From Swiss-Prot:
Gene name of the encoded protein: ffh
Gene Ontology MF annotations: 7S RNA binding; ATP hydrolysis activity; GTP binding; GTPase activity
Subunit structure: Part of the signal recognition particle protein translocation system, which is composed of SRP and FtsY. SRP is a ribonucleoprotein composed of Ffh and a 4.5S RNA molecule.
Localization per Swiss-Prot or TrEMBL: Cytoplasm
Annotated family: Belongs to the GTP-binding SRP family. SRP54 subfamily.
Residues annotated to bind GTP: 101-108, 182-186, 240-243
This protein's name: Signal recognition particle protein
Function: Involved in targeting and insertion of nascent membrane proteins into the cytoplasmic membrane. Binds to the hydrophobic signal sequence of the ribosome-nascent chain (RNC) as it emerges from the ribosomes. The SRP-RNC complex is then targeted to the cytoplasmic membrane where it interacts with the SRP receptor FtsY. Interaction with FtsY leads to the transfer of the RNC complex to the Sec translocase for insertion into the membrane, the hydrolysis of GTP by both Ffh and FtsY, and the dissociation of the SRP-FtsY complex into the individual components.
GO CC field: signal recognition particle
Protein species of origin: Helicobacter pylori (strain ATCC 700392 / 26695)
Length: 448
């Protein structure tokens, strides 16, 4: 995410080499302008950002650090709007949220992603299928609800208003914390759609109306969001499909253009790939500093503290087993796409695009490891050191792999186990900190 913009900002920075060089500042601003417009930032937003950066840089004296500080401060101002980040809960549950958007915007999938996000916060969520315009919408929400592990409310041969009313009643009676209503979409905005949304909104009296905007729609998405806001009132925007070769400009400008807070960003195809939009954190990514806080939050949502402690003890003693290995793979899968996770780590933003299609679920290597482990006895799974030649031949036969592949996987597992053991001791932690420090020092000031 934001890699093209981040690279463009670095190019602009490199135009400034000496202090108090106004011509260099002009070149940097020109490069910044090209980057913004090339990445689909609205011309009014680009003009305002350039104005802020120029004014702030000149105020503090022209130089690389001053330009960076001005850019960081100006980006934060452009990205900030009145309203909350992430999800806001009502004082008295259930919190009712009406999800709105055009057909094909990813509204239904985003609704399920939001349900997953809330479930990681230990909230009881009810999904309501009110999109009766698209034939597969109800079925899609049912399937997604099952994947997430939340209840989906739907009714046949009922009007949208009846379904919404009954869903609200169900949410209150069963003491759900949150009710997410997937409303109808259209290929284009029309009076019929808006009238239906107004009627549903009147019945639900929702605490939030979140508009799902397709990141690939560019400025058309901003215009559509503005129309929805004028017609039914929108409290926040969720940007979907942001990983799909999006230029990133819509995220940079939609808050400033509409005056509405951007609440979440869909950062991948997987259900967990939904990131809270916190302006300070996004500026960090834009400046090449990653987003360690969001990464820590995602990790904490799937890791049990007691399990982590037990695993740490095993690693220190060199007792990491194949079962532990598979368990950790399952944990990582729950965090979302690899590219989304990598983009949060300082200095590794460039790797995110290379890992865009990396999927642990469909990875051939992971499938081979699973096949190998499933062909082992319980004793072998817990004691890798007993895997002699005859055992490896039997495992190869049972898993459909070559003995050479079994040997290779076991060797890599052994290397990983030794490395993990090394990193759990004091010297290993020191080495890791030094490595992170080196990576940090390879980038320009503040472009961490």
């Amino acid at each position: 995410m934001f890699q093209a913009l981040s690279d463009g900002f670095k190019n602009a920075l490199n135009k400034i080499r000496f202090q108090d060089d106004e011509k260099a500042l002009d070149r940097a601003l020109d490069e910044l302008k090209k980057t913004l417009l090339k990445n689909d930032v609205h011309h009014k937003v680009a003009r305002e950002l350039l104005k802020k950066v120029e004014s702030q840089t000149k105020l503090n004296g022209i130089g690389k650090q001053q330009f960076l500080d001005a850019l960081e401060k100006s980006l934060l101002e452009i990205l900030s709007a009145k309203g909350s980040s992430g999800f806001t809960f009502a004082q008295t549950p259930p919190t009712v949220v009406l999800m709105a958007g055009l057909q094909g915007s990813g509204k239904t999938t985003t609704t399920a992603k939001l349900a997953h996000y809330l479930k990681t916060k230990n909230k009881k969520v009810l999904l309501c299928a009110c999109d009766l315009q698209r034939l597969a919408a109800v079925e899609q929400l049912k399937v997604l609800g099952e994947q997430v592990g939340v209840e989906v409310f739907y009714e046949e041969n009922k009007s949208v208003k009846e379904i919404a009313s009954n869903a609200l009643k169900r949410a209150k009676e069963a003491q759900f914390d949150v009710l997410l209503v997937d409303s109808a979409g259209r290929l284009a905005i029309d009076k019929e759609l808006m009238q239906e949304l107004k009627e549903v909104k009147e019945i639900l009296n929702p605490h939030e109306v979140l508009y799902v905007a397709d990141a690939l729609s560019g400025q058309d998405g901003v215009k559509s969001a503005n129309t929805f806001n004028e017609e039914i009132g929108v409290s926040g925007v969720v940007l979907s499909k942001f990983d799909s070769d999006s230029k990133g400009g819509i995220a940079l400008g939609i808050t400033y253009q509409l005056g509405l807070p951007l609440r979440f960003i869909g950062s991948g195809e997987k259900i967990p790939d939904l990131d809270v939009f916190v302006p300070e954190r996004i500026v960090g990514r834009l400046m090449g500093a990653g987003d360690i806080v969001s990464l820590a939050e995602k990790t904490a949502s799937v890791l049990n503290p007691n399990e982590a402690k037990d695993l740490s003890k095993k690693l220190k003693k060199g007792q990491f087993t194949f079962n532990d290995f598979l368990n950790q793979i399952e944990k990582v899968k729950k965090l979302g796409s690899m590219s989304s996770l990598i983009s949060m780590i300082p200095g590794l933003g460039n790797m995110a695009s290379a890992l865009k299609d990396t999927d642990l679920e469909s990875s051939l290597e992971v499938k081979k490891i699973k096949a190998m482990v499933n062909s082992m006895t319980k004793k072998e799974q817990e004691n890798p050191e007993i895997l002699n030649g005859s055992r490896r031949k039997r495992i190869a036969l049972g898993s459909g792999l070559e003995v050479s592949e079994i040997n290779r996987i076991i060797k890599r597992f052994d290397q990983a186990s030794k490395m993990a053991k090394r990193l759990t001791n004091k010297k290993g932690i020191s080495d890791l900190m030094n490595l992170m420090s080196q990576a940090k020092n390879q980038t320009p000031p503040k472009m961490r």
